[in-house]
A protein has these predicted regions:
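N-terminal membrane topogenic signal
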Residues: 1-17
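Alpha-helical transmembrane segments of multi-pass membrane proteins
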Residues: 48-52, 73-78, 135, 139-146, ...
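Cytoplasmic-side transmembrane-helix entry/capping segments in multi-pass membrane proteins
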Residues: 40-42, 61-72, 95-98
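Membrane-interface helix-boundary motifs at transmembrane edges
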Residues: 4-6, 53-65, 120-126
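Short, highly charged, low-complexity non-transmembrane loops/tails of multi-pass membrane proteins
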Residues: 239-260
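Membrane-interface helix caps and helix-loop-helix hairpins in membrane proteins
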Residues: 30-35, 57-58, 83-93
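Membrane-interfacial alpha-helical segments at the cytosolic side of multi-pass membrane proteins
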Residues: 100-117, 155-161, 220-234
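Interfacial helix-loop-helix junctions of multi-pass membrane proteins
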Residues: 83-94, 140-225
Length: 262
């Protein structure tokens, strides 16, 4: 209990510090006249409230450790990544966030299926492996839907969410001079765009490599959490690491106690 109380205090302090930094960022963007970034800052403050909203509406207790990871993830994606251009300044920033996203979405999927698993309205009780598999599938589905969103924004609104990738060589059937269905290897040193030569050391892939990389690291994050979830359920909720990361479904008694406290 003391350890959990300490985590809650740390979570609260981190949220206050991050919120203060976001407010300062919003004010700065306002004075700079960058209203798009100002909107992103306001959106960040709203997203900070999502864990508490889910806690109340779904009768799920989000551990302080997991909530802290969520808050840092939101701050890293919107304030550092978008407003401060960490996606450009730090090449692996996007990879880190997509891996974390796979982990977090698996946690949410785990909590959702656990709601059904513990509900008195359902007679079927699912095994730890099925719960973990559902969490994994939920995370991957969210990852795929996000890539659909990135593609749509690029295609219809001229954005660049699916980042470009320099590919130094290709293997292509199309470039085989004999016309045979045999790929040939071609090293690419430069490319020509509208008559202008760009010596980039390769050709410019406009999304497929970035998309596949994002899905692969999302897969890794989802697998890691699913393994943690299996161990947690097989050991009947024991383990400090798992307990600090896995949302807990509140019992009726805990829910009534929580309602009285509010």
């Amino acid at each position: 209990m003391k350890a959990n109380s300490g985590l809650k205090k740390s979570r609260t302090k981190i949220q206050m510090v991050l919120s203060a930094l976001v407010i300062l960022s919003v004010a700065r963007q306002f004075f700079l006249g960058n209203y798009h970034n100002m909107f992103l800052g306001i959106l960040t403050l709203i997203l900070f409230m999502v864990p508490q909203f889910l806690d109340r509406k779904l009768s799920v207790t989000i551990p302080p450790g997991l909530e802290t990871v969520i808050l840092i993830f939101i701050f890293s994606a919107e304030i550092l990544g978008e407003i401060n251009a960490f996606y450009v300044k730090i090449p692996i920033w996007d990879t880190i966030l997509h891996t974390t996203n796979g982990f977090l979405m698996a946690a949410i999927g785990f909590a959702l299926i656990d709601l059904f698993n513990r509900s008195d309205r359902f007679s079927i009780k699912m095994s730890p492996y099925f719960v973990a598999f559902f969490a994994f599938c939920f995370s991957m589905t969210v990852g795929v839907m996000w890539e659909f969103f990135e593609f749509s924004m690029d295609w219809f609104f001229g954005m660049d969410m699916q980042k470009d990738w320099i590919v130094p060589a290709i293997n292509s059937v199309k470039l085989n001079p004999t016309g045979a269905n045999v790929p040939i290897h071609v090293d690419v040193q430069s490319l020509v765009v509208n008559g202008e030569t760009w010596n980039l050391g390769g050709y410019l892939d406009i999304g497929i490599v970035d998309t596949m990389k994002d899905l692969i690291v999302n897969f890794i994050g989802a697998v890691v959490f699913s393994i943690i979830g299996i161990l947690y359920l097989r050991n009947r909720g024991k383990g400090k690491l798992a307990a600090s990361l896995i949302p807990q479904v509140r019992s009726k008694q805990e829910e009534e106690h929580s309602s009285r406290d509010q």
